[in-house]
């Protein structure tokens, strides 16, 4: 992998070793998932292909971002957080920050920091990846 990857993601079905290679400790672990008949996809920045997350980290595919369809993700890597701001969304007010690809600095989504609604607090610490800003990496 190129130097642009602090962490890169490898298909766990193709290698007997850990599926997440890192200079540091691995950040991802597919927990309690059967590896039979599971389609593994690595998602990256659409512009520079830096790895961001995997299909094993998707919580929901039923989200809308600024540019259209988005995924709610449990973990992402290789991003830097932008300025913290308050945003009004369909489900309430949130304290969020944009997340930028650490290599090319393009916006790929945002991180939920705090929710004003108790029933939306499960989103805190989770990430939105906008599909128009990401791609499938092979």
From Swiss-Prot:
InterPro entries: Yippee, Yippee/Mis18/Cereblon, Yippee_fam. Residues 41-138 form the Yippee domain. GO terms for molecular function: metal ion binding. One of its GO terms (cellular component) is ubiquitin ligase complex. Pfam families: Yippee-Mis18 (PF03226). Zn(2+) binds at residues 45, 48, 101, 104. Belongs to the yippee family. This is Protein yippee-like MOH1. The gene is MOH1.
């Amino acid at each position: 992998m190129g130097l642009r990857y602090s962490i890169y993601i490898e298909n766990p079905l193709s290698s007997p070793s850990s599926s997440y290679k890192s200079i540091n400790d691995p950040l991802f672990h597919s927990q309690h998932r059967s590896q039979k008949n599971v389609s593994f996809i690595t998602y990256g920045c659409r512009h520079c292909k830096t790895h961001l997350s995997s299909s094993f980290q998707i919580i929901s595919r039923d989200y809308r971002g600024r540019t259209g369809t988005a995924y709610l993700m449990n973990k992402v890597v290789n991003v830097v957080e932008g300025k913290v701001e308050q945003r009004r969304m369909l489900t309430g007010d949130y304290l969020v920050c944009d997340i930028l690809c650490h290599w090319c600095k393009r916006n790929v989504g945002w991180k939920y920091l705090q929710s004003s609604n108790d029933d939306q607090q499960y989103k805190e610490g989770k990430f939105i990846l906008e599909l128009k800003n990401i791609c499938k990496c092979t």
